[in-house]
């Protein structure tokens, strides 16, 4: 599997009741989205995107929001002058799921188009 394989996938609804990915499983998927980092004992996936100004960061955050709404899998987004921080976690399982990596790959693809 590579990042292209991840972007071809759709998020599947997570109803909870399943275990989150282990740190080892998350590390294997992280290889496909190398600009992202695991945080909080491998329960979150985070990347900070850099921009020339606040409005570019705000526009990117809006595009990420639209993408995530279409997939039904929503990140925590933080913006400030020259940056947009995107953090995924599957809240129903309090950890990471393949959906988080699918969305990270799709956000990377969106950033490459910007």
Swiss-Prot record:
User: Gene3D superfamilies recorded for this chain?
Assistant: Transcriptional coactivator/pterin dehydratase
The answer to whether the entry has keyword Mitochondrion is: no
Leading EC class: lyase
- List UniProt keywords, sorted A-Z: Lyase
Q: Which GO terms describe its molecular function?
A: 4-alpha-hydroxytetrahydrobiopterin dehydratase activity
What is this enzyme's catalytic activity, as reactions?
Answer: (4aS,6R)-4a-hydroxy-L-erythro-5,6,7,8-tetrahydrobiopterin = (6R)-L-erythro-6,7-dihydrobiopterin + H2O
Taxonomic superkingdom: Bacteria
UniProt GO BP: tetrahydrobiopterin biosynthetic process
The keyword Lyase appears for this protein = yes
- What Enzyme Commission number(s) apply to this enzyme? 4.2.1.96
Q: Cite the HAMAP family for this sequence.
A: Pterin_4_alpha
Q: So what family is this one in?
A: Belongs to the pterin-4-alpha-carbinolamine dehydratase family.
| Protein name per UniProt | Putative pterin-4-alpha-carbinolamine dehydratase
């Amino acid at each position: 599997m590579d990042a292209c394989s991840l972007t071809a996938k759709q998020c599947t609804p997570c109803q909870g009741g399943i275990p989150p990915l282990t740190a080892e499983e998350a590390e294997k998927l992280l290889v496909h989205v190398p600009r992202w980092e695991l945080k909080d004992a491998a329960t979150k996936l985070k990347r900070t995107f850099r921009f020339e100004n606040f409005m570019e960061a705000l526009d990117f955050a809006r595009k990420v929001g639209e993408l995530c709404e279409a997939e039904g899998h929503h990140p925590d987004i933080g913006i400030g002058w020259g940056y947009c921080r995107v953090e995924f976690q599957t809240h129903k399982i309090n950890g990471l799921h393949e959906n988080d990596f699918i969305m990270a790959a799709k956000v990377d693809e969106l950033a490459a188009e910007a």
